[in-house]
């Protein structure tokens, strides 16, 4: 699948997901290439159809995009609930376990998700896998002592790599932390790994989102299809 085909599937999933946002809602808006299409469609509906809703974003770049359409964006602490959060995912399996954080927004994404009544992910079909872990698992760590955390990960066989930008500088999250990507190839026991990571001093959050999502909208060549989590 080339990039144009992949983008077409992402766009279709984003347009389908935008239908979930209705007048008067408070909607969490995620981060990433698929969410960009979602925000474009919500912006179109706001400007052309008069859709009025309040957004809570998981990154500053999504906030800038949404506000460019005139969408009202507020801080998460200025709302008492979030009706639905729509976000992308880097991988998702049949048990609705996912990896997120390829865009370095995993902490804000998880905070918004855990305060939402409903969580929806939008992905293209390449992101649906049998076992998560092929995509590197992002872990957000504070800069102080990050090298020590990386050494611990190396000792555990996690194959950590500090994420750098095109200029060779450390990628910084919106909270000014570092991102360490774990090249695990496959994750057979995600819950155990999640507990190990979050209990490591210096780790702020990890990109494992386990059985959190209610619905996954998959961009498919035959049209968007919906995976519904029966355990939620």
Swiss-Prot record:
* Any one Gene Ontology molecular-function term assigned to this protein's record: ribose-5-phosphate isomerase activity
Q: Which CDD domains match?
A: RPI_A
Q: Where is the active site?
A: 109
Please give the HAMAP family that the UniProt record associates with this protein.
Answer: Rib_5P_isom_A
Q: What class of enzyme is it?
A: isomerase
Keywords carried by this UniProt record: Isomerase
The superkingdom listed in its UniProt entry is Bacteria
E.C. number = 5.3.1.6
Q: What is this protein called?
A: Ribose-5-phosphate isomerase A
- Function summary: Catalyzes the reversible conversion of ribose-5-phosphate to ribulose 5-phosphate.
Q: What pathway does the annotation place this protein in?
A: Carbohydrate degradation; pentose phosphate pathway; D-ribose 5-phosphate from D-ribulose 5-phosphate (non-oxidative stage): step 1/1
């Amino acid at each position: 699948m080339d990039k144009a085909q992949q983008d077409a599937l992402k766009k279709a999933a984003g347009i389908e997901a935008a239908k979930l946002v209705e007048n008067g809602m408070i909607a969490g808006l995620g981060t990433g290439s698929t969410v960009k299409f979602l925000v474009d469609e919500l912006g179109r509906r706001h400007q052309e159809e008069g859709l009025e809703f309040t957004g809570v974003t998981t990154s500053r770049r999504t906030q800038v995009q949404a506000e460019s359409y005139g969408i009202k964006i507020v801080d998460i602490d200025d709302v008492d609930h979030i009706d639905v959060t729509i976000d992308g995912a880097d991988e998702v399996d049949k048990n609705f376990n996912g990896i997120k954080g390829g865009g370095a927004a995993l902490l804000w994404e998880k905070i918004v998700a855990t305060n939402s009544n409903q969580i929806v992910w939008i992905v293209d079909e390449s992101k649906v896998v049998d076992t998560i872990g092929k995509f590197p698992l992002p872990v957000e760590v504070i800069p102080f002592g990050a090298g020590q955390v990386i050494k611990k990960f190396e000792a555990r066989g996690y194959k950590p790599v500090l994420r750098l930008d095109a200029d060779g500088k450390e990628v910084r999250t919106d909270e000014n932390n570092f991102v360490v990507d774990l090249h695990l190839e496959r994750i057979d026991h995600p819950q155990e790994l999640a507990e190990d990571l979050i209990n490591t001093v210096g780790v702020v959050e990890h990109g494992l989102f386990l059985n959190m999502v209610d619905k996954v909208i998959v961009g498919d060549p035959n049209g968007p299809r919906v995976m519904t989590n029966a355990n939620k």
